[in-house]
Amino acid sequence: MIAVINYGAGNLPNVVRALQRVGATLTVTDNPEVIRSAQAVVLPGVGATADTMASLRHLGIAEVLPAVIAASTPFLGICVGMQVLLSESEEFGLHSCLDIIPGTVRRLPEHAGKIPQIGWNQLQISPTFRNHPLFADIPDGADVYFVHSYYCAVADEAIIAARTDYGIPFPSVIIRDHLAAVQFHPEKSGDYGLRLLANFVRWSEAVQPKGV
């Protein structure tokens, strides 16, 4: 059972429908104990990191997620669900995040063009991750859909599985052990987005979490 975290994110229904379309067995929950015992966890998100962190803390989810990820529970963060994994965010002032992935959430550079980036852009998959299960049947250069003004400046470049250019080459996918996170919206990314979600479902089914 995949736990899809419900903390009020606007893209939650679309993420749920996309996961159901690829055959996922899931529950939508804001219960920390359900999240703790899940076979896999998906954290969707749109909006500001500070607001998201406030909701996660209020629900008691912020305290559970580090332990869930440390237990090797397969995890997928989407958009802001990726950004809150970092140490801190510069969005609307400096705010602390979950500090699971060392790094800072920073604004896209003004010379990139229109901010936020809204629309299709390419994944440049790192050769190191080319054969990772998450990228099965997804070619290098695949177009996926972005809506964001901030990006994840991660401290460890070895976890950057794919980059995308928008003024700068920013991490669009990170993978560390059984944690994956994407800056784009797979639920809006057509066939390639559905493939990534299907790949995550298969990947999560093959992993046995250690238990929290």
UniProtKB/Swiss-Prot annotation:
Its EC number(s): 4.3.2.10, 3.5.1.2
Listed GO biological process terms: L-histidine biosynthetic process
Pfam families for the chain: GATase
Active site: C79 (nucleophile), H185, E187
Localisation: Cytoplasm
Keywords: Amino-acid biosynthesis, Cytoplasm, Glutamine amidotransferase, Histidine biosynthesis, Hydrolase, Lyase
Keyword Transmembrane helix: no
Record domain Glutamine amidotransferase type-1: where: 1-210
PROSITE patterns for this protein: GATASE_TYPE_1
Pathway note: Amino-acid biosynthesis; L-histidine biosynthesis; L-histidine from 5-phospho-alpha-D-ribose 1-diphosphate: step 5/9
One GO molecular-function entry: lyase activity
Catalytic activity: 5-[(5-phospho-1-deoxy-D-ribulos-1-ylimino)methylamino]-1-(5-phospho-beta-D-ribosyl)imidazole-4-carboxamide + L-glutamine = D-erythro-1-(imidazol-4-yl)glycerol 3-phosphate + 5-amino-1-(5-phospho-beta-D-ribosyl)imidazole-4-carboxamide + L-glutamate + H(+); L-glutamine + H2O = L-glutamate + NH4(+)
SUPFAM superfamilies: Class I glutamine amidotransferase-like (SSF52317)
Record carries keyword Nucleus: no
Main location: cytoplasm
Gene Ontology cellular component terms for the protein in this record: cytoplasm
Oligomer status and interactors: Heterodimer of HisH and HisF.
Known function: IGPS catalyzes the conversion of PRFAR and glutamine to IGP, AICAR and glutamate. The HisH subunit catalyzes the hydrolysis of glutamine to glutamate and ammonia as part of the synthesis of IGP and AICAR. The resulting ammonia molecule is channeled to the active site of HisF.
Protein name (Swiss-Prot/TrEMBL): Imidazole glycerol phosphate synthase subunit HisH
